[in-house]
């Protein structure tokens, strides 16, 4: 039996989403429920996949099935396609299995020709309606199917309205519209070299192909990447009998939700327009009326709609987004789907549906997407204000939140103005660790270069600052202190605004509203926590970040980067002395200055954690990052004075630190191998801090010491011996011992494939997936943004491997290391501390491979908690 590629609505059901797409499955389900659905058929997602496999051709067997389904639908309608007296017209719409509103294409009124439009005008005794439908169809078909610029058609309409002195398209007469149709067909012939097609079957097949093609249009590709929708799913095509909302004042069209999608309030929410077609509502040319007014204008239709809406929500057990048309007083349902909603509404609806007895706690947890929580935790722009603000540029949405401030081009300037309580946006080509203070005092960060895991992105997320990175449209002149975007020049102190959730950069100031976490949030997250197995820690380097993360539900620190503490203004001089020292004695003298500062940092962190665990990563970055640039004369002179050498000698030493490839150079555990005294100082700081806080507060602290960038067992054994020897001395001096653990970051591919050997020394593994991704692909994460766009365009990649874990490659190394490590040490604790720890799909993977915890930026902690709950619930359900 031939494979079935086309299903009539009556042949499908809601469980066939993968085959029929969301729209097709729901149209089938509404048909089965006996609702007034204009009939039609769905061409499956498998037909779309085959269309691409066959070289963008629809196979003859699929064409035959489409024509057979068309004949069945004609019988139901009692009309014929292309008939000159009573023509059968259809809409052609996309429908992927995941909702992608507005991303793909729609064509209405298909089947109209020069002959059938006359029949439609005579049949309805309404030539205005018939020619209005025809001009809409020609414009849509030309735009969507043939890619003729739609502004050419809009210009003709504007010309006619101006000539006739009217405001709206509907105010043009039937004779005007006949002339518009002639002009539209002329535009089509000018572009295509042939007349507008007059065979409805040709129109239909071209439209189906266009919907398949639209699966790969730029906005659909971007939307898929943003929402983790696989590119090989394809879209279905729904061919549906047309019903008309533009047949006079007893006709109309609208969109409604069973609950308020902004607040979650249990109240019908929606709009409609009389004498209009669907796109009129969306286009916003006319102001729609609230659906409550329909009760006055058409009480019977309104009551029927309320009954259907109630039935649909009860059936789908979720808030529904419905499209409907009223044709001459008769209601038709064109679509239902689970409605898109704000994060606040999602929480309220989930909690309310549990209270109403509709959902279990676990089912409710699955109703909220983890990424949605982002917007709850950061300040947001006022919705009305942001609509009016001009967008001047767009970059990568690296760290969510809304920020408005004056622009400054150096971290020092940003910090200076920030300390004066001014609102600041730090604008840089790219940020470096030295910019940390300026970033801290900024509301937002904007960079020309860098990707989603660049320094600016990672640090901004950790701080909860809005950040837009990789905004290539910007031109920065640091000397003149100007930012040029297009032909507009901004000077230091001029105001711009950033939306870190969308990547938009706006001109001027936009009012913001603080994020408010509702009681529903705490209750909902309690249900999520009860369901998950995976623990969630945070990446934090300051007590403030730690407290914020604990407030968001972090169960400890999975990554405390000690180098961030070294950049503080009061200690960078001592750090530089240590780096540029010639002898061990000089180095130890400088380290003695740093020790009390580092110990004080750890004490503050342990107190903020209140007994929760903390993994401290020893010094990791290349040393050149800590020293001043050779052209920073004041800093060089001061350093020379402190070291008792000349400025020229300091410059010589700085130049000697230069490396061709610093990310694979003298960093990580290699620093401890060459300078053991650094590891000694850090061990003292960690253990003495733990002892002091244990004595003072009574917490049961078990320090976790993590050695970075280990590639072999011997490397780890060498550094671990320094830790153990120093620990012995500290315990003797303090007259007290503590349990502590030494582990390593798995971030070099060799460490992953020899994990069984490394586990002989390591008591825990933490996967540093930022570096592991970088080294596995051979990509520099700070430069990958220059070519990843081409990889997306050419379908080599569907998502950024630095933002979403590459489970096929990097993930296999994680899986291998986990398995090998536990063969050696069955109780080996496993975590992940790269930025992937806050990505929902990556958290899902971590659950599957049996990790103990994920660690992420403080503002991503709730997202990881919810993603971990999703993973556990879906596993339980066998999905």
Summary of predicted features, one role per range:
Residues 330-332, 432-440, 444-446, 452-458, ...:
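Glycine-rich phosphate/ribose-binding loops and adjacent secondary-structure elements
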Residues 41, 448-450, 469-472, 560, ...:
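Short beta->alpha connector loops at strand-helix junctions that form conserved
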Residues 93-94, 517-519, 527-879:
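Conserved alpha/beta-domain cores
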Residues 208, 215, 377-405, 409, ...:
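Flexible inter-domain linker/hinge segments
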Residues 394-434, 485-523:
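Extended, non-globular alpha-helical segments
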Residues 238, 408, 425-427, 446, ...:
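Structural motif
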Residues 1-389, 415-418, 422-425, 432-434, ...:
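Nucleotide/phosphate-binding sheet-loop regions of phosphoryl- and nucleotidyl-transfer enzymes
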